[in-house]
Design a protein with these regions (language model features):
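Bacterial signal peptide processing site
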Residues: 16-19
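C-terminal motif of bacterial Sec signal peptides marking the signal peptidase cleavage site
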Residues: 11-14
Length: 184
C-alpha cells in the first residue's frame, strides 16, 4: 500500500508537469574562468573574418564568400597549431572548440544548395559562439541575433546592438540583439 501511494504521487506529479511551451535549448554557456587575454586577441581576429563571411553571404557574392571562408579556415589552421594556453586543460578547451568550428566551416564549403548553405552557416555560427563562450571571450561585446520567425530560427552575431538578417536578402530590417554572449 505504501508503494502504491508513492507511485500514484509520482504519476500525479508527472501529469501536472505539462510542457506545452517550446523548451529552450541552451546552445552555449559563458565561462569567464577560462578567459585568457591572448585568446581574446586571436578570437577577435577570427570574429572579424567571420563577419566577412556573414556580410558576403548577405550580398550573395559567391566568390567573395568562398574566399572569406577559405581565409578563415587558414587562420583557424594556424591557431590550432599555435596554442598559447597556460595549461593542458585550457588548451583542450581552445583546441577542441576551434576544431569543431573548423569542421563546420569545412562542411559549409561542401554545401551547394542555398537552403543547405544557410543551415550550415547557422551551424558555423552556433559552433563559433559556443567556442567564444567556452574560452570566456571578453574583448568586445558580442551581440547574438535570432529572428523571431518559425521558418528561420537561425543565429547570427555582430559587434553592434542591431543588425540585418544575413539569411534573408528580402528583409533589410534592423533587428535588436536577442542575447549578449557575456550575459546569462
Amino acid at each position: 500500500m505504501k508503494y502504491l501511494f508513492v507511485i500514484i504521487s509520482l504519476l500525479l506529479l508527472g501529469c501536472e508537469n505539462n510542457h506545452t511551451l517550446k523548451e529552450e535549448t541552451i546552445l552555449w554557456e559563458f565561462h569567464p574562468k577560462n578567459h585568457q587575454d591572448q585568446w581574446d586577441l586571436q578570437a577577435f581576429q577570427l570574429m572579424n573574418e567571420y563577419q566577412a563571411i556573414q556580410n558576403n553571404f548577405t550580398v550573395s557574392d559567391s566568390v567573395a564568400f568562398k574566399i572569406a571562408v577559405q581565409q578563415l579556415m587558414n587562420s583557424t589552421d594556424t591557431l590550432l597549431t599555435h596554442s598559447t594556453a597556460t595549461d593542458s586543460l585550457t588548451q583542450n578547451i581552445w583546441i577542441s572548440g576551434l576544431q569543431i568550428f573548423k569542421n563546420e566551416l569545412e562542411a559549409l564549403v561542401l554545401e551547394t544548395e542555398p537552403s543547405e548553405k544557410q543551415a550550415q552557416l547557422n551551424m558555423c555560427t552556433v559552433a563559433f559562439i559556443h567556442f567564444l563562450a567556452d574560452i570566456g571571450y571578453t574583448k568586445t561585446n558580442v551581440y547574438i541575433f535570432q529572428k523571431p520567425d518559425e521558418d528561420n530560427g537561425y543565429f547570427w552575431f555582430g559587434f553592434n546592438k542591431t543588425s540585418k538578417d544575413p539569411f534573408d536578402l528580402s528583409d533589410r530590417k534592423e533587428y535588436s540583439a536577442s542575447f549578449t554572449l557575456q550575459e546569462p
